[in-house]
UniProtKB/Swiss-Prot annotation:
<protein>
    <recommendedName>
        <fullName>Serine/threonine-protein phosphatase 2A activator</fullName>
        <ecNumber>5.2.1.8</ecNumber>
    </recommendedName>
</protein>
<feature type="compositionally biased region" description="Low complexity">
    <location>
        <begin position="363"/>
        <end position="388"/>
    </location>
</feature>
<keyword id="KW-0547">Nucleotide-binding</keyword>
<keyword id="KW-0460">Magnesium</keyword>
<keyword id="KW-0539">Nucleus</keyword>
<keyword id="KW-0067">ATP-binding</keyword>
<feature type="region of interest" description="Disordered">
    <location>
        <begin position="343"/>
        <end position="398"/>
    </location>
</feature>
<feature type="binding site">
    <location>
        <position position="137"/>
    </location>
    <ligand>
        <name>ATP</name>
    </ligand>
</feature>
<keyword id="KW-0479">Metal-binding</keyword>
<dbReference type="GO" id="GO:0000159">
    <property type="term" value="C:protein phosphatase type 2A complex"/>
</dbReference>
<dbReference type="GO" id="GO:0046872">
    <property type="term" value="F:metal ion binding"/>
</dbReference>
<feature type="binding site">
    <location>
        <position position="297"/>
    </location>
    <ligand>
        <name>ATP</name>
    </ligand>
</feature>
<dbReference type="GO" id="GO:0003755">
    <property type="term" value="F:peptidyl-prolyl cis-trans isomerase activity"/>
</dbReference>
<feature type="binding site">
    <location>
        <position position="203"/>
    </location>
    <ligand>
        <name>Mg(2+)</name>
    </ligand>
</feature>
<dbReference type="GO" id="GO:0005634">
    <property type="term" value="C:nucleus"/>
</dbReference>
<dbReference type="InterPro" id="IPR037218">
    <property type="entry name" value="PTPA_sf"/>
</dbReference>
<dbReference type="GO" id="GO:0045175">
    <property type="term" value="P:basal protein localization"/>
</dbReference>
C-alpha cells in the first residue's frame, strides 16, 4: 500500500492487486469493477453529449472541494521545481513531488470526506495516489489514468458524488486531473509508460478521446475530417476534450500529424463522432483493459471489487446521437437505481452545421455492432479504422 495512506481505526476491507497472472484476466473481465467501470465510462459519454467543457454546468459543493484538492497538488509542483540534470527524460524532482503528494493526500481526503464516508478514505486514497505516475521509473501512462477512473467511479459508488454530478465530474474534475497530469509530464519530462509509439492512440491518455468524441456526438460544429485543421484546433481546444488532446499533441510533437499520430490520423476517415466513440471504447477494452502489463498493477477494494458479477450480466452501452438517452441506456454504477438525470446545459452549443447522425448508432459495448467501427494496431501505413458492414462510404481527407 502506498506510503502516507494509513487505515483509520476499525476493520476495513483489504486493498490489493488481484491480477497475478494471465489466468486472472478472465476473472477481471467478469468482475463487478470491470462492469462498473464500463458502465461509468459509457454512462458519462451519454450524459455529456452536446455539452462543451466551457458551458455553465452544475457544480456541487463536494465537487468544488475535489477541485480545490487539485489546487493543493498543483502547488506542490511549484514547491518542487525540476532539477538541472544531464538526462533528457525523467527529472528526479518528480520523486520529491510524488513523496510530498503521498504525504499530503491523507490530510486532504480527511478534510474533504464527511464523517459517514471516512471508511472509504484508504481505498480512495490508494486510487488517487496511483493516478499520477510511477516515482521509480518517472513515467506516466494509461494505467495511471485508469486508476483515476477507479477513483471517479468510486466517488459515485460511495455516493460521495451524486447523480447530478455526472457531467461536472467529467468536464470539470476529470479535466482538472488532465491539466495536472500534463503539467507533471512537461515539468518533469516524464516518459510514456507502455506506449507503442506511432501505433498508440496517444503516449499518455485515452479516456479524454472517448469522452471528447461523446461531447461532439450531437450538434458538432465540425465533422471528424476537420479535427486536425489548425483553425479548428485553435477555435475549439478549450471547448472539447478531444480537441484539447489534439492541441497538446501538436505542442509536444513535431512533423506531419499522420506520421507521429497515425492512429488518430486514421480517425479522420470515420463519418460520425458517434461511430468514433464506439470504436474508441472497443479499442480501450482491447488495448488497455485486456492487457496484463496494465491490469497487474491495478488495486481493488470494497468499492471497486474483484468479486464476479452474476452469470449472464451484460456490459452497459453508450447510445449516442440522442440529447436525452433512454433510461435503459443511462449510467448504472453498482446499483440499478443510480441513474443520472438528463443533462441540461444552461448555455446551449452555438448554432452550427450538425453532423448527419442516425438516431440509433452503434452501441459502445463489448459485442460487435453493425454500426460501429473497430480501431486496431497495424504495422502498415493503411487506415487503422475498419468500418462495419453497411456503414457507408467514408469521406476522403482534404
Amino acid at each position: 500500500m502506498a506510503s502516507g495512506i494509513n487505515q483509520a481505526a476499525g476493520k476495513l476491507p483489504a486493498i490489493a492487486k488481484k491480477v497475478q497472472n494471465l489466468g486472472d484476466m478472465g476473472v477481471w473481465q467478469k468482475s463487478r469493477a470491470f462492469h462498473d467501470l464500463i458502465g461509468y465510462i459509457n454512462g458519462t459519454s451519454s450524459a455529456i453529449q452536446g455539452i462543451k467543457t466551457t458551458d455553465e454546468i452544475f457544480e456541487s459543493e463536494m465537487l468544488k472541494k475535489l477541485l480545490r484538492l487539485f489546487d493543493a497538488l498543483e502547488k506542490l509542483v511549484e514547491q518542487n521545481p525540476p532539477l538541472e540534470q544531464p538526462q533528457r527524460f525523467g527529472n528526479k524532482a518528480y520523486r520529491d513531488w510524488a513523496q510530498a503528494m503521498r504525504e499530503l493526500l491523507p490530510e486532504l481526503l480527511e478534510q474533504l470526506l464527511p464523517d459517514d464516508k471516512k471508511r472509504y478514505q484508504v481505498e480512495l486514497g490508494q486510487y488517487l495516489t496511483e493516478s499520477f505516475g510511477n516515482a521509480t521509473r518517472i513515467d506516466y501512462g494509461t494505467g495511471h489514468e485508469l486508476s483515476f477512473l477507479f477513483f471517479l467511479c468510486s466517488l459515485f459508488k460511495a455516493e460521495i458524488l451524486q447523480e447530478r454530478d455526472i457531467v461536472s465530474a467529467a468536464l470539470r474534475l476529470f479535466n482538472r486531473y488532465l491539466e495536472l497530469a500534463r503539467q507533471l509530464q512537461r515539468t518533469y519530462n516524464m516518459e510514456p509508460a507502455g506506449s507503442q509509439g506511432v501505433w498508440s492512440l496517444d503516449d499518455f491518455q485515452f479516456v479524454p478521446f472517448i469522452w471528447g468524441s461523446a461531447q461532439l456526438a450531437v450538434k458538432s460544429p465540425f465533422d471528424p475530417s476537420k479535427f486536425v485543421d489548425e483553425a479548428i484546433i485553435t477555435e475549439y481546444k478549450d471547448h472539447f476534450m478531444f480537441i484539447s488532446c489534439i492541441d497538446y499533441i501538436c505542442k509536444v510533437k513535431t512533423g506531419h500529424f499522420g506520421e507521429h499520430s497515425n492512429q488518430l490520423w486514421s480517425i479522420t476517415d470515420v463519418p460520425t463522432w458517434a461511430k468514433i466513440n464506439a470504436g474508441l471504447v472497443k479499442m480501450y477494452q482491447k488495448e488497455i483493459l485486456s492487457k496484463f502489463p496494465v491490469i497487474q498493477h491495478v488495486y481493488f477494494g470494497e468499492l471497486m471489487t474483484f468479486e464476479p458479477v452474476s452469470s449472464g450480466t451484460t456490459l452497459s452501452n453508450a447510445r449516442l446521437g440522442h440529447v436525452a438517452p433512454p433510461p435503459s441506456k443511462r449510467i448504472c454504477i453498482g446499483t440499478p437505481n443510480l441513474v443520472p438525470p438528463v443533462p441540461v446545459a444552461t448555455a446551449p452549443p452555438p448554432p452550427a452545421e450538425s453532423l448527419s447522425i442516425e438516431q440509433n448508432v452503434g452501441d459502445s459495448s463489448s459485442e460487435s455492432s453493425d454500426n460501429s467501427v473497430v480501431l486496431r494496431p497495424s504495422t502498415s501505413s493503411s487506415s487503422l479504422v475498419a468500418a462495419a458492414e453497411g456503414s457507408g462510404d467514408k469521406p476522403s481527407k482534404e
